[in-house]
């Protein structure tokens, strides 16, 4: 389980709670509104975030190191109302009852405690959530640190990831301190530079990166008055930045182990709530929660020592239990069957040795209802046993009803229908390193309860799917696909380990060469993988411009290095060669070699069929969908994927621009449909429109930019996002998008209509009626709402493309069997299908595969498939 640290800015949240709620007091006349609001927030965080570690930070006193640097810091702030001051001791008592550590540090602010612990936790691999009412903390946002800013109400929050910070301010989180340095902050009495507001500050920082760079480049700035102001207030700008910067190295004398969350002291919490008069919280605590472990009513079943006729009914719910996450060749620990005759538990050694039971498992006419049937099917295949006749899969049904639920066991699916007679797998097996199979009586009851739940839930799930017009999606698409994926997983993909090892040696040699070149350019040897040492070389020795600082010194992140590439050859070597080659070596070469099975010489991936919200498949252990294609060295890794038989070849077929073709169909845009019907190069056509040039005048760069516009539109991209992608101004990006919509007005109409439809219905659908619910589409938070709107635009397109390729897999599998070909599906990678087949079947596949794929569905525009074959996956291009 991923460790998660929640850090709360206690003073800020208490202040917000106090002013968000009317003055409340208990029967002793003590004011309690801030404590009440704080409790609301705590309960919400504990329920939603499930933190493993937690701390509330408070300001220690009125003076800090910032006051020493600038006496007027926070001057002019109103005194804390006495009605709030008297509640701080109660807040401390509340935290003691909840067993959440509270911490303050002399000479520092709560922000510095939070910044320091967030930095430590991130380095230790934690996910971190910061809660505050102070936007200054958005500077802490990073890939693993999210900052939730409370808004008007105490539980109404605005989440800030690095992307959200960029969306709101047009700056990175690291630049927030530079923003304060230039424009100041009235709430903290940080002066900044007189006359510079947010707009000017953002403009300067987007041009120069930091306050220091702005001050070093005054001569390049337009406007004499602005130049003079910056010269006069240079020191104040630097001081203001220093005042705004949150410390990441405060002397916090706590370890992360010290703030592990152990759960509340229930007795103390109840006693405190009674004292404070928090009746509503008391009622929630005293009423049994559906989340709590409740004793289940007894369920009668037979613990059978042999297979009997009544177990082998025409219809049954079946559980074939595999506890290990990777179910390839994993032990089956138990089997449960529930049907009209009763409930039965069978030991696997009994059931799987019985010819009648094995025949029943493989009988297509004996209908079986299961949860995640693919898992059981693959585990059985490794034992030479076939599973057929799966007529209902609860996992897939739950996934279709709401893909955002993240259903991962029978209990989670049961919860969707308020069925409570089954426990979560984690409650029985434990989790992580403590996961283990319990004694047989406990195991038997758990498996029987799971089978009984599947038996009881099939009808209500199917009824709702029918109401949603999704029953055919389950029965005709997802369930048949599950069987095909099981075959693909079990078959695996053969890997030429010698070739992979050879590539590893070649990469290692390239890395050594690049390493030596970097040392030559640096004039000394150093640890290239150390951001600290690399920062010293780049910014102190080679004097490259400092674009941003990290919590530990100079930032040497990929985005920084990309901007520095024109300044020195060493940067290109570090970024494009050393880092990329290093990742290929560690992630792909070494990573793949670790998962090749010695007995089959293959990798056996796991396709996740019920994970993404768009319906796309993903794969894990290993992830074969992210084998790199941009870098030639990365593409070469595909040379190691070879056919299973010596006289076979790899055949690859992929849909050409399927998402844009789906967009043309859904939007019914005449110009876009006409372009595809005439088989025009759609990116060239778009370039002609947005640059207003003839076909002959379209340059490769214009086509590249047009391609970014085409695919950006599919994802509901904003002018800001497009500007970032193409490294152009927002104005240019806005003009590109405007011209695109002028050329394809049907697309604009579709984008507007689909967002309105999502707001009315709460969801969007694909061509085959797959739904994606978008509860945030009406959010008052602009960033949250905008993201939901982009999902509304994209999901019908991406989801329909996913549906089409799934349908193509089913149709193709059927045709291969119908024509008695030996060819078989190996992989599905985004819009591409990979097969292997004997050489003599290639000619037939060149006709059959594109024919089947192009006829999977009928659109208003033709589907187009490109195909190639060769002795390796790399050669099939």
From Swiss-Prot:
According to the entry, every stretch annotated as the 5'-3' exonuclease domain falls at 1-310
SMART domains named among the record's database cross-references: 35EXOc (SM00474), 53EXOc (SM00475), HhH2 (SM00279), POLAc (SM00482)
Top EC class of this enzyme: transferase
Write down the PANTHER family for this protein, in alphabetical order. DNA POLYMERASE I (PTHR10133), DNA POLYMERASE NU (PTHR10133:SF27)
Q: Residue limits of the 3'-5' exonuclease domain?
A: 311-465
- Keywords noted in UniProt: DNA damage, DNA repair, DNA replication, DNA-binding, DNA-directed DNA polymerase, Exonuclease, Hydrolase, Nuclease, Nucleotidyltransferase, Transferase
Region of interest called Polymerase, as start-end residue ranges on this chain:
469-877
Per the record, the GO terms for biological process are: DNA-templated DNA replication; double-strand break repair
What Pfam families does the annotation carry?
5_3_exonuc, 5_3_exonuc_N, DNA_pol_A, DNA_polI_exo1
Describe its partners and assembly state.
Single-chain monomer with multiple functions.
| Record bears the keyword Manganese | no
UniProt lists the gene as: polA
Which InterPro entries does the record associate with it? 3'-5'_exonuclease_dom, 5-3_exonucl_a-hlix_arch_N, 5-3_exonuclease, 5-3_exonuclease_C_sf, DNA-dir_DNA_pol_A_CS, DNA-dir_DNA_pol_A_palm_dom, DNA/RNA_pol_sf, DNA_polI_exonuclease
Record field: catalytic activity: DNA(n) + a 2'-deoxyribonucleoside 5'-triphosphate = DNA(n+1) + diphosphate
Enzyme Commission number(s) from the entry: 2.7.7.7
Matches recorded under CDD domains: DNA_pol_A_pol_I_C, DNA_polA_exo, H3TH_53EXO, PIN_53EXO
What's the name of the protein?
DNA polymerase I
Q: Does the keyword DNA damage apply?
A: yes
Family named by the database record: Belongs to the DNA polymerase type-A family.
Taxonomic source organism: Bacillus caldotenax
Purpose: In addition to polymerase activity, this DNA polymerase exhibits 3'-5' and 5'-3' exonuclease activity.
A GO molecular-function annotation: 3'-5' exonuclease activity
Superkingdom of this entry's organism? Bacteria
């Amino acid at each position: 389980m991923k460790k998660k640290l929640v850090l709360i800015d206690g003073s800020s949240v208490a202040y917000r709670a106090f002013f968000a709620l009317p003055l409340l007091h208990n029967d002793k006349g003590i004011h309690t509104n801030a404590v009440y609001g704080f409790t609301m927030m705590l309960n919400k965080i504990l329920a939603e975030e499930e933190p493993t570690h937690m701390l509330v930070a408070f300001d220690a006193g009125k003076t800090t190191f910032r006051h020493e640097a600038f006496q007027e810091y926070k001057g002019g702030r109103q005194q804390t109302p006495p009605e709030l001051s008297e509640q701080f001791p109660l807040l401390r008592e509340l935290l003691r009852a909840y067993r959440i550590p509270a911490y303050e540090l002399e000479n520092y602010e709560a922000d510095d405690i939070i910044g320091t612990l967030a930095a430590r936790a991130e380095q230790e691999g934690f996910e971190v959530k910061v809660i505050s009412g102070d936007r200054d903390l958005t500077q802490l946002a990073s890939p693993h640190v999210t900052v939730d800013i409370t808004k008007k109400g105490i539980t109404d929050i605005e989440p800030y990831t690095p992307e959200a910070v960029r969306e709101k301010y047009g700056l990175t989180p690291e630049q927030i301190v530079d923003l304060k340095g230039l424009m100041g902050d009235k709430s903290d009495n940080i002066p900044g530079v007189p006359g510079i507001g947010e707009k000017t500050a953002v403009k300067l920082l987007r041009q120069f990166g930091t306050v220091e760079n702005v001050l070093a480049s005054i001569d390049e700035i337009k406007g004499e008055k602005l130049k003079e102001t910056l010269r006069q207030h240079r020191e104040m700008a630097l001081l203001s930045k220093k005042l705004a910067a949150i410390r990441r190295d405060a002397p916090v004398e706590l370890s992360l182990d010290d703030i592990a969350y152990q759960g509340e002291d229930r007795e103390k919490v109840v006693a405190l709530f009674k004292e404070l008069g928090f009746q509503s919280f008391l009622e929630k605590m005293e009423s049994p929660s559906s989340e709590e472990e409740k004793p289940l009513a007894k369920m009668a079943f037979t613990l059978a020592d042999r297979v009997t006729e009544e177990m082998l009914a025409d219809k049954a719910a079946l559980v074939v239990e595999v506890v290990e996450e990777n179910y390839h060749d994993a032990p089956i620990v138990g089997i449960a069957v529930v049907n009209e005759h009763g409930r039965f538990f069978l030991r696997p050694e009994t059931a799987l040795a019985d010819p009648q039971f094995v025949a029943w498992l493989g009988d297509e006419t004996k209908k079986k209802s299961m949860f995640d049937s693919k898992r059981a099917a693959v585990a059985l295949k490794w034992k030479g046993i076939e599973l057929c006749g799966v007529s209902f899969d609860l996992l897939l049904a739950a996934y279709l009803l709401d893909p955002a639920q993240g259903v991962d066991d029978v209990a989670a699916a049961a919860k969707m229908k308020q069925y409570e007679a089954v426990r979560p797998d984690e409650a029985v097996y434990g989790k992580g390193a403590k996961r283990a199979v319990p004694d047989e009586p406990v195991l038997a009851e758990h498996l029987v309860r799971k089978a009984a739940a599947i038996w009881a839930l099939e009808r209500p799930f199917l009824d709702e799917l029918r109401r949603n017009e999704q029953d055919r999606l389950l029965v005709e698409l997802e369930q048949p696909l599950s069987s095909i994926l099981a075959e693909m997983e079990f078959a695996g993909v053969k890997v030429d380990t010698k070739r992979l090892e050879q590539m590893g040696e070649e990469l290692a040699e390239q890395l050594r060469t690049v390493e030596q070149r970097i040392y030559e350019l640096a004039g000394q040897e150093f640890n290239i993988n150390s951001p600290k040492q690399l920062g010293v070389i780049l910014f102190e020795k080679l004097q490259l411009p400092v674009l941003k600082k990290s919590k530990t010194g100079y930032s040497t992140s990929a985005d920084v290095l990309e901007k520095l590439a024109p300044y020195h050859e060493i940067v290109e070597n570090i970024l494009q060669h050393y880092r990329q080659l290093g990742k290929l070596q560690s992630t792909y070469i070494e990573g793949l070699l670790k998962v090749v099975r010695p007995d089959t010489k293959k990798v056996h991936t796991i396709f996740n069929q019920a994970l993404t919200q768009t319906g796309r498949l993903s794969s894990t252990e290993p992830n074969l969908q992210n084998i790199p294609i941009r870098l030639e060295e990365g593409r070469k890794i595909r040379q190691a994927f070879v056919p299973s038989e010596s006289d076979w070849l790899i055949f690859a077929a992929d849909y050409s621009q399927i998402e844009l073709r789906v967009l043309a169909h859904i939007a019914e845009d005449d110009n876009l449909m006409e372009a595809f019907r005439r088989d025009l190069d759609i990116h060239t056509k778009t370039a002609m429109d947005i640059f207003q040039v003839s076909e002959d005048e379209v340059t490769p760069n214009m086509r590249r930019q047009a391609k970014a516009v085409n695919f950006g539109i599919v994802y509901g991209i904003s002018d800001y996002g497009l500007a970032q992608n193409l490294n152009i101004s927002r104005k240019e990006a806005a003009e590109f998008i405007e011209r695109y919509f002028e050329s394809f007005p049907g697309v604009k109409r579709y984008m507007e209509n689909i967002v309105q439809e999502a707001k009315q219905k709460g969801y969007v659908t694909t061509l085959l009626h797959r739904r994606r619910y978008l509860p945030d589409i009406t959010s008052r938070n602009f960033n949250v709402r905008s993201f939901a709107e982009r999902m509304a635009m994209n999901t019908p397109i991406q989801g329909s493309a996913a549906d089409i390729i799934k349908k193509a897999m089913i149709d193709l599998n059927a045709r291969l069997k119908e024509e008695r070909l030996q060819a078989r599906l190996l992989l599905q990678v985004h819009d591409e299908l990979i097969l292997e087949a004997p050489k003599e079947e290639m000619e037939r596949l060149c006709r059959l595969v594109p024919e089947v794929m192009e006829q999977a569905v009928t659109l208003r525009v033709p589907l187009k498939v490109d195909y190639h074959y060769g002795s390796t996956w790399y050669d099939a291009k």
